[in-house]
Amino acid sequence: MNIQALMQQAQAMQKQVEANVEKAKKELADKEVQAEAGNGLVKVTMTGRHVVKRLSIDPSLLEDEPDLIEDLIAAAINAAVTKADELSETTLAKATSGMGLPPGMQGLFG
């Protein structure tokens, strides 16, 4: 195989990876994860691209101290971010599987 053929093969592979990654990003924008804090007192729904779609606060919390509400909101959002990151990693790994990329390279496309 000559150099020009290798270059063409590499370019074709790059285009395929880019198309798969774009498709995966669109898929992540449509998928949602949910997380909660305080045994469900605060719930967050977020897309796989880290866009918060819903925030639910149990009415009983509104009578408590604001510091508790703030802490629970932060905890719920952080839990949702973790879940969204896991979803993103899985989705992008599927999008780039079979491309012969070394381990850890899928993270470059997030």
UniProtKB/Swiss-Prot annotation:
InterPro entries: YbaB-like_sf, YbaB/EbfC. It is found in: Cytoplasm, Nucleoid. Keywords: Cytoplasm, DNA-binding. Coiled coil: none annotated. GO terms for molecular function: DNA binding. Pfam families: YbaB_DNA_bd (PF02575). The keyword DNA-binding applies. Gene3D superfamilies: Nucleoid-associated protein YbaB-like domain. Homodimer. PANTHER family: NUCLEOID-ASSOCIATED PROTEIN YBAB. Binds to DNA and alters its conformation. May be involved in regulation of gene expression, nucleoid organization and DNA protection. Belongs to the YbaB/EbfC family. This is Nucleoid-associated protein PsycPRwf_1729. It comes from Psychrobacter sp. (strain PRwf-1). The lineage of its organism: Bacteria, Pseudomonadati, Pseudomonadota, Gammaproteobacteria, Moraxellales.
